[in-house]
């Protein structure tokens, strides 16, 4: 049974957050595979937000376009690329994956001074550089062309 969000729903001051990984739900639902930075690479790329709907409605499972949880990541699947490693300002991404604690320290501790600047809204600043100017930014990257192919039209290969 599908229930709609009530008209009188009040969003708490601290926002809404799920107690599960939206990226993992999207992966299990067949929407993409994981990258070296732990982001989900979909047909529209890695630079996105995920959300899910909890329901008891019956759906027919869709076929998966991939067989490995890291198939769309050029570094994990063929040892090429690694652009997200280069893009990370705090060294939280390396050949072995994403150091979530190092990333968290950068986002929530090192950047706290940014929140005091005029016009800043919120209590922390996200980073997301590992999801921009990379071959998987806006699509599933083409194999064997990780460095030669810019992530977005108009960017140089090593921007």
Name each region found by the language model.
Residues 1-158:
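Catalytic cores of enzyme domains
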């Amino acid at each position: 049974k599908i229930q709609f969000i009530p008209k009188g729903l009040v969003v708490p001051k601290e926002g809404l957050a799920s107690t599960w990984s939206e990226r993992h739900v999207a992966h299990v639902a067949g929407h993409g595979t994981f990258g070296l930075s732990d982001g989900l690479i979909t047909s529209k790329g890695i630079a996105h937000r995920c959300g899910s709907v909890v329901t008891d409605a019956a759906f027919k499972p869709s076929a998966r376009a991939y067989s490995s949880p890291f198939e769309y990541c050029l570094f994990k699947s063929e040892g090429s690329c690694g652009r997200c490693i280069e893009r990370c300002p705090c060294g939280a991404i390396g050949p072995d994956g994403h150091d979530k604690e190092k990333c968290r320290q950068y986002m929530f501790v090192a950047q706290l001074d940014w929140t005091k600047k005029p016009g800043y809204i919120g209590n922390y600043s996200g980073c997301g550089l590992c999801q921009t100017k990379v071959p998987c930014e806006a699509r599933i990257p083409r194999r064997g062309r990780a460095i030669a192919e810019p992530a977005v039209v108009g960017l140089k290969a090593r921007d």
